[in-house]
Regions:
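Conserved core of the sugar-phosphate nucleotidyltransferase
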Residues: 1-39
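PLP-dependent aminotransferase class I/II
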Residues: 12-16, 293-371
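Catalytic donor-sugar/metal-binding loop of nucleotide-sugar-dependent glycosyltransferases
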Residues: 50-63
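N-terminal "arm"/small-domain region of PLP-dependent enzymes with the aminotransferase-like
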Residues: 85-140, 227-228
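Short loop-beta-helix segment that forms the pyridoxal 5′-phosphate
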Residues: 141-142, 153-175
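PLP-dependent aminotransferase-like
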Residues: 178-234
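Active-site pre-lysine segment of PLP-dependent enzymes
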Residues: 215-226, 240-303
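Conserved small/polar residues in nucleotide/adenosyl-binding loops
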Residues: 373-383
Length: 384
């Protein structure tokens, strides 16, 4: 009988057959007729061949497929996948892939360099614990925001009432941007989820005029000083440029914003990939309380290696804002697997630190081996 535990041993058949007249007349067709009478018509015809091979020595041969492109189409989903695989023009093929925004396990041969995900976490120990609890997590409702904000606070050592948990950071970004008023300062190029959520005429864009798109706190202060913005978006490290500003300098920017009544929206989704990552985050009660104009957003997809869980957090000492975000999302906005990840994460905190260190080692090795220019360089200490 078929077993998913043994799929590595199975072959997938591309069903193009060539039978001799004698084989068809004396073996295949008689067995096919007997099989349909015994089992019915709504069965796979390959089963007939399987029965024949078990009962009789046959001279059936199979040709292994190597680089040939093929796809079996049984339903509308298969047709959609095949349309992407067999698109004639590269531009059309790219369009077919990009409109999916994920789900690329349907294309096993694809190498995805778009989404930066830590391949060294979760550790095998953590995966084992999640596998062991799969059945109960699959069949039980998750908790609501009260419990999940408590868990997120535990993971990041931040008070529960400063935290909101989202179905990915994207859910929180959508809710926040819909509530934002006034003009938004944005450094381009950027992660488009933020500016896409507000009217274009409300965006004040700053594009660094240099080769590596680098900028400092002083650059931001100089450009936005007279722009009358209500919110300044800082993605740090930036996506996609990689520009990085140290935590002390970000605090200088937070103070500058506070003096001018500007909200600093800080996205730290990639901060754990930075060289000094353990001292680069502003996720702490003390900092949040000192700067009530500061909002920190963090995706749990990237450095934690779990984009499929759809998990993100938002933190601020502006409790009215956090409470408003919590009311805006649905009662069960994350699933049981994402909740359980937060529930057990602290047991594997050391594994996570090792994974981040290993990621940095591999990045350095890769850059050296391929003679790549990285931005920012590990030695690049940008000052304000």
């Amino acid at each position: 009988a078929f077993s998913y535990a043994e799929t590595y041993r199975y072959y997938k058949t591309v069903n193009i057959y060539k039978f001799s007249r004698e084989f068809s007349r004396h073996k295949y067709v008689p067995f096919l007729e007997a099989y349909t009478k015994a089992v019915g018509n709504n069965e796979y015809y390959e089963q007939v061949l399987r029965v024949i091979t078990l009962l009789d020595k046959t001279d059936l041969k199979a040709l292994p497929i190597t680089t040939e492109k093929w796809y079996e189409i049984d339903d509308v989903q298969d047709l959609d996948i095949a349309s992407a695989l067999f698109a004639d023009q590269p531009a059309e093929r790219k369009k077919q892939y990009m409109r999916r925004y994920g789900g690329y396990w349907r294309f096993p041969g694809m190498l995805d360099f778009c989404y930066l995900v830590n391949p060294y976490f979760p550790s095998e120990r953590m995966r084992d614990e999640m596998r062991a609890n799969f059945d109960v997590l699959l069949t039980e409702y998750p908790s609501g925001m009260y419990v999940n904000s408590l868990l997120a606070g535990k993971c990041f050592n931040v008070q529960q009432h400063y935290m909101a948990v989202g179905n990915g950071a994207a859910e929180l970004i959508k809710s926040l941007m819909e509530k934002a008023e006034g003009r938004l300062g944005v450094v381009y190029p950027t992660f488009e989820e933020y500016p896409n959520r507000i009217a274009k005429e409300r965006i004040v864009a700053f594009t660094p005029q240099n080769r590596d798109l680098s900028y400092t706190v002083a650059d931001l202060q100089h450009f936005f000083a007279d722009k009358q913005i209500s919110t300044l978006l800082l993605i740090n490290p930036d996506n996609p440029s990689g520009n990085f500003i140290s935590a002390p300098d970000v605090l200088l920017l937070a103070e500058w914003c506070r003096e001018r009544g500007i909200t600093l929206l800080l996205d730290e989704s990639f901060v754990d990939f930075s060289t000094d990552w353990q001292t680069s985050s502003l996720l702490s009660d003390g900092i949040l309380e000192a700067y009530p104009n500061l909002i920190v957003v963090k995706s749990i997809s990237k450095s934690f290696g779990v984009p499929g869980l759809r998990l993100g957090i938002m933190a601020s000492s502006n409790e009215d804002l956090i409470a408003d975000i919590k009311r805006d999302v649905s009662i069960w906005n994350i699933n049981s697997f994402a909740e359980f990840f937060m529930q057990i994460y602290n047991k594997y905190d050391k594994d996570y630190k090792r994974a981040c260190e290993k990621f940095q080692e591999e990045r350095a090795r890769f850059a050296k081996a391929c003679l790549l220019y990285t931005s920012p360089s590990p030695r690049d200490k940008r000052q304000s």
